[in-house]
């Protein structure tokens, strides 16, 4: 079972399609790509938006998957 993590969007660039989430547990910032955002609308995030996600190890560090805005 995958652990769900909550955090706040540190920043997200909709033109480039990626950004970073700061987990509420104080752990290292997590990379997020627009393709990981679960939405039927335009896949973007806003600074300081609260989200829930799972983390996987990506090629350059932790990467968010199954990102849902709260």
UniProtKB/Swiss-Prot annotation:
Residues 7-67 form the CSD domain. InterPro entries: Cold_shock_CspA (IPR012156), Cold_shock_domain (IPR050181), CSD (IPR011129), CSD_CS (IPR019844), CSP_DNA-bd (IPR002059), NA-bd_OB-fold (IPR012340). One of its GO terms (cellular component) is cytosol. One of its GO terms (molecular function) is DNA binding. The keyword Metal-binding does not apply. It is found in: Cytoplasm. Pfam families: CSD. The keyword Repeat does not apply. Keywords: Activator, Cytoplasm, DNA-binding, Transcription, Transcription regulation. SUPFAM superfamilies: Nucleic acid-binding proteins. This is Cold shock-like protein CspJ. It comes from Salmonella typhi. The lineage of its organism: Bacteria, Pseudomonadati, Pseudomonadota, Gammaproteobacteria, Enterobacterales.
């Amino acid at each position: 079972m995958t652990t769900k993590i909550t955090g706040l969007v540190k920043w997200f660039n909709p033109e480039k399609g990626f950004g970073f989430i700061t987990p509420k547990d104080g752990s290292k910032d997590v990379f997020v790509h627009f393709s990981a955002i679960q939405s039927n609308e335009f896949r973007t995030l806003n600074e300081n938006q609260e989200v829930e996600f799972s983390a996987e190890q990506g090629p350059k560090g932790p990467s968010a998957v199954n990102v849902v805005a709260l």
